[in-house]
């Protein structure tokens, strides 16, 4: 609980993302005993932390945000070296991360996360109804796995950690091996904020090393898992959690190709513009966004041919970029090779992939691959590449979309004249994705109350939640009901006097009124 430990003997080195050379930062792989100590520290902190008022927890989150804001230019330079991300992107991501913490602080002060429901007793009814009162409490210690592509917003102090801490759950972070020094700086900021706010020891913990995640997920003190990463990694954690003597939920955001459908009237009116905008979305951040449009669909026509040609030109004109690390580049190259080897797929545009940087690529696949259930097109290629598919008619387009797996997002690019003809695609896409876009691009994910960053498997392991936005807190809460409890023993959210001033559901009616 806040104590540093380096009992292991395996030294881990942070690497320069551009050169692959070791940076002057060394870390030690956590031992099994250290993983146990971290989980136990979180377990000890949980009873005290969850009983703190929402206002106290809100102050803690705001203190973390302020500490992140205070990290200087040296921190930005460090993140830049570990990830190859440009300074402006890092600064923007830091602001996003801090504001996300502040947004959850607002949620705590607002109080609706309590989900207060009261059905007052009716002793004169036959049979009598007991007095029943429900609210929600934190699940317990949460293991969080940092993501490679967002070293701040989806990592140590990112959305999963913010949501768990807001819910009253201590956190144990498994630092991502691609930005360990960044993780250490952020962890220090969190620990300083915890001390400033008077939080219990063990409210935040972090461990390093490959393989330690397995021990963390299996640990009996851990009550839930938050993960952002590959389908392989997320599925492995889900299987581990399900095999525990006491299974726990895993909220994993894993794989999505984010289909984008370009409708005929949009092609006719602004096909080249859409091609330029789409190329910008595909290559944003070197294509290392889980919301990158990885599959583009349209109806066979001269207009679609012209659009595909313009998209190829736009992608070919964009420069190669450095990826997050050598492993990410290697995975990108392997993904391109799988596409190139497939007889039903051909490369349309892009420089030959060579060297230390990733070149944008455009491929075209036969629609029959989707119709026949070929799994290759369902696999995300993490990097600046996308695949186009043309359907013969509306019926074939709908069938192709219907054969897609679950997605984080699905996009329609169209005009008013397209809406009547293609409105039937909307209920189909509603079954496939967590966020539907019209005339926009999915790479931007706003942090707000209404956002859903989730979707059916394999986009996530649980389609009922989101990892971005204030609804994310609900993943780490569970309902608790009190029957015929005396008012003095009830939490403030359920007391008759309603001291928190909450909007509560009382006997089927929403009200802020105190009860008699």
Protein language model features and the residues they cover:
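N-terminal Rossmann-like NAD(P)+-binding subdomain of aldehyde/semialdehyde dehydrogenases
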Residues: 1-130
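Structural signal for hydrophobic packing residues in well-ordered secondary-structure cores
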Residues: 46, 50, 65-72, 76-79, ...
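Conserved C-terminal structural/oligomerization subdomain of aldehyde/semialdehyde dehydrogenase
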Residues: 21-24, 198-201, 222, 296-297, ...
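Short, flexible turn/loop "capping" segments at secondary-structure junctions
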Residues: 14-19, 252-255, 286-291, 375-381, ...
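Rossmann-like NAD(P) dinucleotide-binding subdomain of oxidoreductase/dehydrogenase enzymes
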Residues: 112-275, 279, 301-304, 514
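ALDH superfamily catalytic-core signature
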Residues: 189-193, 232-372, 399
């Amino acid at each position: 609980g806040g104590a540093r430990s380096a009992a292991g003997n395996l030294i881990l080195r942070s690497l320069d993302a551009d050169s692959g050379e070791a940076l002057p930062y060394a870390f030690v792989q956590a031992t099994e005993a250290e993983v146990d100590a971290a989980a136990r520290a979180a377990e000890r902190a949980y009873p005290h932390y969850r009983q703190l008022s929402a206002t106290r927890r809100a102050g803690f989150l705001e203190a973390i945000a302020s500490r992140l804001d205070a990290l200087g230019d040296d921190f930005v330079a460090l993140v830049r070296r570990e990830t190859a991300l440009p300074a402006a992107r890092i600064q923007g991501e830091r602001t996003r991360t801090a504001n996300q913490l502040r947004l959850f602080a607002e949620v705590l002060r607002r109080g609706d996360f309590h989900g207060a429901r009261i059905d007052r007793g009716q002793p004169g009814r036959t049979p009598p109804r007991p007095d029943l009162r429900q609210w929600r409490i934190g699940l317990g210690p949460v293991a969080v796995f940092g993501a490679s592509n967002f070293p701040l917003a989806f990592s140590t102090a990112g959305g999963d950690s913010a949501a768990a801490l807001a819910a009253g759950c201590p956190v144990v972070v498994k630092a991502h091996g691609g930005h360990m020094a960044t993780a250490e700086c952020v962890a220090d900021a969190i620990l300083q904020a915890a001390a400033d706010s008077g939080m219990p020891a063990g409210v935040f913990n972090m461990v390093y090393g490959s393989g330690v995640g397995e021990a963390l997920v299996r640990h009996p003190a851990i009550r839930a898992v938050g993960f952002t990463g590959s389908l392989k990694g997320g599925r492995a954690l889900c299987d581990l959690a399900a095999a525990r003597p006491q299974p726990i939920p895993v909220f994993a955001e894993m794989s999505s190709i984010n289909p984008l459908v370009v409708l005929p009237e949009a092609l006719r009116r602004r096909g080249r513009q859409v091609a330029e905008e789409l190329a910008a979305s595909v290559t944003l951040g070197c294509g290392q966004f889980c919301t990158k449009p990885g599959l583009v669909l349209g109806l066979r026509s001269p207009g679609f041919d012209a659009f595909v040609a313009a998209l190829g030109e736009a992608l070919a004109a964009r420069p190669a970029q450095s990826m997050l690390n050598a492993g990410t580049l290697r995975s990108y190259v392997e993904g391109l090779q799988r596409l190139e080897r497939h007889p039903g797929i051909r490369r349309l545009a892009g420089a030959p992939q060579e060297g230390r940087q990733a070149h944008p690529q455009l491929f075209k696949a036969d629609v029959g691959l989707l119709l026949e259930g070929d799994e290759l097109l369902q696999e995300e290629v993490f990097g600046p590449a996308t695949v186009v598919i043309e359907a013969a008619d509306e019926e074939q387009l709908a069938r192709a979309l219907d054969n897609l797996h679950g997605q984080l997002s699905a996009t329609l690019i169209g005009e008013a004249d397209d809406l009547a003809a293609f409105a039937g695609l909307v209920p189909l896409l509603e079954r496939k994705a967590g966020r539907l876009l019209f005339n926009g691009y999915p790479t931007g994910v706003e942090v707000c109350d209404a956002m859903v960053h989730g979707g059916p498997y394999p986009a996530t392991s649980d389609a009922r939640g989101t990892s971005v936005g204030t609804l994310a807190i609900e993943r780490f809460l569970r309902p608790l009901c009190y029957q015929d409890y005396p008012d003095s023993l009830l939490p403030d959210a359920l007391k008759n006097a309603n001291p928190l001033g909450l909007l509560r559901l009382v006997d089927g009616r929403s009200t802020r009124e105190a009860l008699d």
